[in-house]
């Protein structure tokens, strides 16, 4: 089992004025830490994978396909693959990002049935 030092990653990104860093990657899963610091905008594009955000610190608004929801520490939000989404209304926002990648019948990410 690999321990993931989420807090150290969050602090490092905060000191660098924000950004994203992957802390785990395997064929079906990516986990990262994303830190947004105003006034820098969230410039995300839709992703190929389903995604879950878990708020570590801060608050803001997450808009998914035109619907907005307030997010605060301890809350989570699901973003389906391909959905337009972005964070707004934050001062400093830190989230854990979990990308769930599709597995084919052999367990390989992105594999398709024969």
What are these regions (language model features)?
Residues 56-57, 72-73, 91:
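A cytosolic small-molecule/anion-sensing beta-strand core signal
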Residues 66-81:
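Short acidic-glycine-tyrosine-enriched beta hairpin
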Residues 81-106:
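Ligand-binding loop in jelly-roll beta-barrel domains
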Residues 1-33, 40-43, 108-114:
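A short, N-terminal "cap"/entry segment at the start of jelly-roll beta-barrel domains
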Residues 47-62:
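Short, conserved beta-strand element in jelly-roll/cupin
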Residues 27, 65-67, 90:
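Short strand-coil-strand connectors
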């Amino acid at each position: 089992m690999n321990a993931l030092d989420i807090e150290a990653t969050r602090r490092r990104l905060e000191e660098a004025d924000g950004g994203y860093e992957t802390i785990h990657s395997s064929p079906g899963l990516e986990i990262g830490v994303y830190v947004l610091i105003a006034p820098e905008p969230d410039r995300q594009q839709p992703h190929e994978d389903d995604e879950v955000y878990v708020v570590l610190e801060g608050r803001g608004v997450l808009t998914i396909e035109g619907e907005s929801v307030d997010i605060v520490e301890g809350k989570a939000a699901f973003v389906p693959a391909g959905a337009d989404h972005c964070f707004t209304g934050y001062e400093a926002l830190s989230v854990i990002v979990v990308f769930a990648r599709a597995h084919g019948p052999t367990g390989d990410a992105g594999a398709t049935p024969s």
